[in-house]
């Protein structure tokens, strides 16, 4: 998608990659993405509430001596989903290892053989291109043609 470097671009790429990656049980044993995506989505929903509760609890009980620890705990809770998105963003821009490159090429060829239009095959694909191909394969190929890989 882009060659930008930095925290903001990694977080943005991580969000896109989270939506792009096919959440399928067949991929669980091969890739850690599904576990990271599930934990990150859970963290996005839950961690802001935990952060607020940790600070508000100290305020309600007038325990201002523990406020610094509560703020640190809140910052840590908020950082957890950000860490997941950062990891996913970096992973999406990582070049595939040679074994996965051949798998990417086989899947790409199989999809184009069945007559579906795809963007041209990349010479040095990244994980985000693999996610696109896997998504397309699960949507458009039948189970018998996918049995070879899963």
Curated annotation (Swiss-Prot):
Membrane topology: Multi-pass membrane protein
Coiled coil: none
Residue intervals passing through the bilayer: 42-62, 70-90
InterPro entries per record: UPF0208
One GO CC term on file: plasma membrane
Domain of life: Bacteria
Localization in the cell: Cell inner membrane
Sorted UniProt keywords: Cell inner membrane, Cell membrane, Membrane, Transmembrane, Transmembrane helix
Entries under HAMAP family matching the protein: UPF0208 (MF_01101)
Protein family: Belongs to the UPF0208 family.
Protein name as it appears in the record: UPF0208 membrane protein VS_0999
